[in-house]
Design a protein with these regions (language model features):
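Short, Gly/Pro- and small/polar-rich lid/capping loops
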Residues: 1-9
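Acidic-aromatic substrate-binding/catalytic surfaces of carbohydrate-active enzymes
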Residues: 9-124
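Acidic, proline/serine/threonine- and glycine-rich low-complexity intrinsically disordered segments
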Residues: 128-129
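Conserved small/polar residues in nucleotide/adenosyl-binding loops
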Residues: 132-139
Length: 143
């Protein structure tokens, strides 16, 4: 699998033999899903993200007066909870102080050419197969 990263390090395109997957870290460091499907080239599909004032959708503080930017309507890769996106959460967290907000924001990335395991989770190990992983690091408020 090939992993293509844009020069500014914010657009990621994963290519298999027959398919492509693309995601993008926007100017507020929210990692957005752009595309999954039939193989495409390396074009930037972030222009497909359509933001419009939905009236009922909340806006994050950093959007300022921009009523068109809402976590509730964006196709987030890793949606948090308690921060303005009222769809189903990917993860629910309760902190020791009883709060539950999880605001995931893109921080950095690395490309690994080997398999890795998360402690306590199942993993595959096969020396006959080459691995390429894109690991997006995100910071989360209150975590």
């Amino acid at each position: 699998m090939a992993i293509k990263v844009s020069e500014n390090g914010r657009l990621f395109t994963l290519q298999t033999k027959d398919s492509s997957y693309q995601m993008f870290a926007d100017d507020k460091n929210v990692l957005l899903h752009l595309y999954y499907g039939e193989k495409i080239g390396e074009e930037n599909l972030s222009g497909l993200i359509f933001c419009t004032d939905m009236g009922f959708a909340g806006n994050p503080e950093e959007a300022g007066p921009n009523r068109k930017y809402s976590l509730d309507t964006l196709p987030q890769e890793i949606p948090g909870s308690g921060v303005g996106d009222f769809r189903d959460d990917m993860i629910d967290i309760r902190h020791a102080d009883g709060s539950f907000a999880a605001d995931f924001r893109f921080d950095s990335f690395e490309i690994l050419d080997h398999s890795y395991a998360i402690p306590g989770m199942p993993a595959l190990y096969d020396t006959a197969v080459s691995y390429t992983h894109l690991r997006a690091h995100e910071t989360a408020a209150n975590l």
